[in-house]
C-alpha cells in the first residue's frame, strides 16, 4: 500500500486551521488581483490591531495559503530612493483553493505599481463596504477594476483624424454609473482631463466620477482645470458634429484627497453611492 504523504499533510493542515470568512475574502481578492499590499490585506481581514493582523497573516503563511515578499518601488516623489512595501501572493494551498498557478513574481517597479496598489486598496474598501453583518453582498456595489474592463479596451475618443484617445477607468461601479479614478500625479497636459469630462458625458453617459488625488494642492489644481473646460467642445467622430462639455461638468466630477478618503471611507462611499 502506497501512502500519499502530501494528502496527509493537506488533511492535517485543514484540521489545524479553519479559514474564516475574512480569510476567504482576502484569498479571493489576491486570486483576482495577483498580489496585494499589507494595508489592503488589513482592510480585508478587518483586524483592528497590528498584532491581531500579523498573527492571522503568520497563520495563513504557515499553512501555505499566502506568501510574503517585499516589493521595491522607485519613485521620483521620493527622490529616487527605494521604498519597500510588504506584499502577499497566493501560496500552494491558496492556489489549490482557487485553481491558480503559483505566482513566482510580484508586480513591477515604478509609478505603475504604486498606482495599482492604490487601486487595490480602494477596491478593498469598496469590497468591505458592500458586505453586511451577515456576510451578504450588495449587488448594486459590484465593481470592476481596470484589469477586467475588457469591454472598455477599444473605447476611443476621436479628437481629430490623427489623434485617438483610449480610456479605461480604474474602478467602475456599473450599476450606479460611478467611476473612481486614482490620479497620483496631475498631468501637465490639461487636455487629458477635458477629454475625460467629454467621454463621461457623451460616450458612456458616466458623468459621476470621483477623482482621488494625492494632495490638497492637486485637488485645487484639478478642480480649476475642470472649471476651465466648462463649455469647451470636442469632436469625437469623423461624421458627427462637435459637442459641448456641459457647463456644470465640474460639479459632476468630485475631487477628494486620498488621505481624507482613507480616514473615513464609509462616509465618502455613503455620500457617493447614496447607500448606507
Short names for language-model regions:
Residues 93-143:
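Amphipathic alpha-helical dimerization/coiled-coil segments
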Residues 47, 174-178, 204-207:
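Short glycine/proline-enriched coil/turn segments at helix->beta-strand junctions
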Residues 1-106:
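Nuclease-adjacent, charged terminal/linker segments that flank catalytic cores
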Amino acid at each position: 500500500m502506497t501512502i500519499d504523504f502530501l494528502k496527509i499533510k493537506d488533511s492535517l493542515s485543514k484540521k489545524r486551521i479553519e479559514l474564516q470568512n475574512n480569510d476567504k475574502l482576502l484569498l479571493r481578492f489576491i486570486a483576482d488581483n495577483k498580489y496585494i499590499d499589507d494595508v489592503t490585506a488589513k482592510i480585508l481581514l478587518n483586524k483592528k490591531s497590528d498584532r491581531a493582523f500579523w498573527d492571522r497573516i503568520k497563520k495563513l503563511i504557515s499553512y501555505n495559503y499566502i506568501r510574503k515578499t517585499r516589493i521595491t518601488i522607485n519613485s521620483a516623489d521620493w527622490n529616487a530612493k527605494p521604498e519597500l512595501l510588504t506584499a502577499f501572493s497566493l501560496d500552494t494551498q491558496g492556489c489549490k483553493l482557487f485553481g491558480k498557478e503559483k505566482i513566482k513574481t510580484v508586480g513591477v517597479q515604478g509609478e505603475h505599481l504604486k498606482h495599482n496598489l492604490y487601486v487595490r486598496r480602494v477596491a478593498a474598501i469598496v469590497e468591505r463596504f458592500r458586505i453586511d453583518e451577515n456576510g451578504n453582498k450588495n449587488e448594486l456595489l459590484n465593481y470592476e477594476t481596470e484589469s477586467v474592463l475588457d469591454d472598455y479596451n477599444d473605447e476611443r475618443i476621436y479628437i481629430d483624424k490623427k489623434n485617438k484617445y483610449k480610456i479605461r477607468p480604474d474602478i467602475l461601479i456599473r450599476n450606479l454609473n460611478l467611476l473612481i479614478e486614482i490620479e497620483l500625479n496631475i498631468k501637465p497636459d490639461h487636455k487629458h482631463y477635458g477629454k475625460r469630462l467629454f467621454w463621461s458625458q457623451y460616450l458612456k453617459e458616466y458623468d459621476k466620477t470621483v477623482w482621488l488625488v494625492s494632495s490638497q494642492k492637486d485637488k485645487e489644481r484639478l478642480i480649476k482645470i475642470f472649471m476651465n473646460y466648462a463649455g469647451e467642445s470636442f469632436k469625437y467622430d469623423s461624421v458627427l458634429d462637435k459637442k459641448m462639455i456641459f457647463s456644470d461638468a465640474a460639479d459632476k466630477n468630485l475631487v477628494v484627497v486620498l488621505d481624507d478618503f482613507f480616514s473615513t471611507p464609509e462616509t465618502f462611499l455613503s455620500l457617493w453611492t447614496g447607500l448606507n
